[in-house]
A protein has these predicted regions:
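Binding-site signature for planar aromatic cofactors or substrates
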Residues: 6-177
Length: 177
């Protein structure tokens, strides 16, 4: 065995020891081509999702928090945003989208191509655009040696009955497109 092979074996052994010292973690940075069943279920419930697109004017990342999100399948996610949102114009210029979610004790980055399904949802008082993301890659991006103790939550700051009614209308509308 050559000198370089010995160093490689020592490095692998070192990495495994570090992994066990820090109590696990995602040393492999697992990459999947589709959503897991757990992520599909999470993306069918109310949750906070970060959406990253490329700003069409500045060509820098643009990140927004959204909650009207629904996973149709392991390969398709829909979300709704105000039609004036920068996300809409960004996707018109560049279809690349990254959705980030904190769930299942970790942080996941979901990359894909976004397509505007409708510029304005029918039957909803707000002017909402629906975008569908075709999932291309799912990465567990949680830093090594840690897990999420709790998932982020939020509270609605407007009329709860009106919010529930609107949320239901948007969810049904996204599914039916």
């Amino acid at each position: 065995m050559g000198k370089n092979n010995i160093f490689a074996i020592q490095k692998i052994s070192y990495d495994k020891n570090i992994l066990s010292i820090f109590g696990g973690g995602n040393m492999a940075n697992v990459v999947e081509p589709t959503l897991t069943d757990d992520l599909v279920q999470t993306l069918r419930k109310e949750c906070i999702v970060m959406v990253a697109t490329t700003d069409f004017e500045k060509q820098v990342p643009n990140v927004s928090a959204i909650s009207w999100v629904y996973a149709l399948s392991k390969t398709s996610i829909r979300f709704a945003v105000d039609q004036r949102s920068r996300i809409v114009e960004n996707i018109r210029h560049s279809t690349g989208v990254v959705l980030t979610i904190m769930a299942n004790e970790s942080v996941f980055s979901i990359s894909g191509a976004g397509e505007i399904l409708t510029d304005r949802m029918e039957g909803i008082s707000l002017k909402l655009t629906v975008i569908e993301v075709k999932v291309q890659e799912v990465r567990d991006v949680m830093f090594y040696g840690a897990k999420l103790a709790t998932e982020p939550t939020y509270e609605k700051t407007y009329d709860l009955r009106a919010a529930k009614k609107l949320d239901n209308q948007v969810l049904v509308g996204m599914k039916e497109l």
